[in-house]
Amino acid sequence: MARSNLPLALGLALVAFCLLALPRDARARPQERMVGELRDLSPDDPQVQKAAQAAVASYNMGSNSIYYFRDTHIIKAQSQLVAGIKYFLTMEMGSTDCRKTRVTGDHVDLTTCPLAAGAQQEKLRCDFEVLVVPWQNSSQLLKHNCVQM
């Protein structure tokens, strides 16, 4: 009878030994981020603001609108550590009175562009995925999905 429990006891002892052999850091800090884990961020975080600017600039370059859009509200922001940092942003955007021209290209300070009013006004709610690689000083819009509000 005692021998039939021996493999179970040895297995449990092995599991306990493995858990005790883990480095103290692996056991003591479960609140730290792991690679690939999504992390909620404040919309006011300066890095979130930079990622949002990059997303809006890329959106404006690819958009067929004759007017620029700018973000009006960052609803939700998350990041994921990959080969760089992926930002997942949910934002509201509004059309502005600033027209796209070949002269200005994409070098317009959108904060100086007033939001459009009346019939010209267009509001969007967008989900953006932006990859920022700080050591290469680059950002890339990977995905976006916008719907009219």
Curated annotation (Swiss-Prot):
Keywords: Disease variant, Disulfide bond, Ectodermal dysplasia, Glycoprotein, Protease inhibitor, Secreted, Signal, Thiol protease inhibitor
Signal sequence coordinates: 1-28
One annotated Gene Ontology cellular component of this protein: cornified envelope
Major localization listed first in the record, in broad terms: secreted
PTM field: Substrate for transglutaminases. Acts as an acyl acceptor but not as an acyl donor.
GO molecular function: cysteine-type endopeptidase inhibitor activity
Organs and tissues of expression: Restricted to the stratum granulosum of normal skin, the stratum granulosum/spinosum of psoriatic skin, and the secretory coils of eccrine sweat glands. Low expression levels are found in the nasal cavity.
GO BP: anatomical structure morphogenesis; epidermis development
Disulfide bonds: C98-C113, C126-C146
Annotated localization: Secreted
Pfam families in alphabetical order: Cystatin
CDD domains xrefs: CY
Residue ranges of the motif Secondary area of contact: 80-84
Residues with attached carbohydrate: N137
Domain of life: Eukaryota
Annotated site location: Reactive site: G36
Role according to the record: High affinity inhibitor for cathepsin L, cathepsin L2 (cathepsin V), and legumain. Involved in the regulation of epidermal cornification, and hair follicle morphogenesis and maintenance.
PANTHER family, per the entry: CYSTATIN-M (PTHR47033:SF1)
Family: Belongs to the cystatin family.
Illness association: Ectodermal dysplasia 15, hypohidrotic/hair type: A form of ectodermal dysplasia, a disorder due to abnormal development of two or more ectodermal structures. ECTD15 is an autosomal recessive form characterized by hypotrichosis and absence of sweating except with extreme exercise. Skin is dry from birth and eczematous lesions may develop in adulthood. Other features include blepharitis and photophobia.
Protein name per UniProt: Cystatin-M
Organism of this sequence: Homo sapiens (Human)
